């Protein structure tokens, strides 16, 4: 956020979860829009943002779908910083319509293409979009979800400026003994793709 935005800029996180991006935006004097399909995430984010600081940031939180940001006009956002769920790995709701965490990989990528198109629409020309995502393992095989999702953003019109590899410390997504029994290595990294419009 420090690298790709300035005080007073508008930041978007369309998979806001508990509101971490919005908290950072508030602390760094950026305005922010947070969107999540899960009403519980909206409530948690609202609670997490109830702190005082010197910032005069405007923070807007909305229960909605990242594939349809109709309430944001074209080319209004200065920076997108988001971390979508990983196709059917951790379910973030119990059947909320439009929750992409419930989808199989191909359906997930189809929805991420819509997310990429909406991101391109709302972002100002020349501005950056940072998306963090990792690969997944299904039935003992690695699915390169990160790079497949990257293609969605490239097809939407973005240019890839950076690929940052973020190491996951204390990775607990797969139990150590399970890796020993099934003879595979942990996926202990995520990607941060930085795209430019």
Residue positions per predicted region:
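Class I S-adenosyl-L-methionine-dependent methyltransferase catalytic core
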Residues: 1-197
């Amino acid at each position: 956020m420090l690298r790709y935005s300035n005080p007073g800029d508008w930041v978007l996180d369309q998979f806001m979860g508990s509101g971490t991006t919005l908290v950072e935006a508030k602390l760094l004097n950026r305005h922010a829009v947070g969107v999540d399909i899960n009403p519980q995430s909206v409530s948690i984010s609202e609670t997490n943002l109830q702190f005082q600081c010197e910032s005069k940031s405007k923070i807007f939180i909305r229960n909605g779908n990242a594939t349809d940001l109709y309430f944001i006009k074209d080319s209004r956002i200065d920076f997108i910083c988001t971390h979508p769920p990983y196709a059917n790995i951790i379910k973030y709701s119990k059947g909320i319509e439009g929750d992409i965490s419930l989808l199989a990989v191909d359906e997930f990528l189809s929805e991420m293409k819509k997310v990429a198109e909406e991101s391109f629409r709302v972002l100002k020309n020349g501005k950056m979009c940072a998306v963090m995502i990792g690969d997944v393992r299904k039935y003992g095989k690695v699915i390169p979800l990160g790079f497949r999702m990257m293609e969605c953003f490239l097809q939407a019109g973005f240019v890839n400026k950076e690929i940052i590899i973020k190491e996951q410390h204390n990775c607990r997504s797969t139990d150590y003994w399970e890796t020993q029994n099934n003879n595979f290595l942990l996926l202990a990294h995520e990607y941060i793709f930085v795209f430019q419009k």
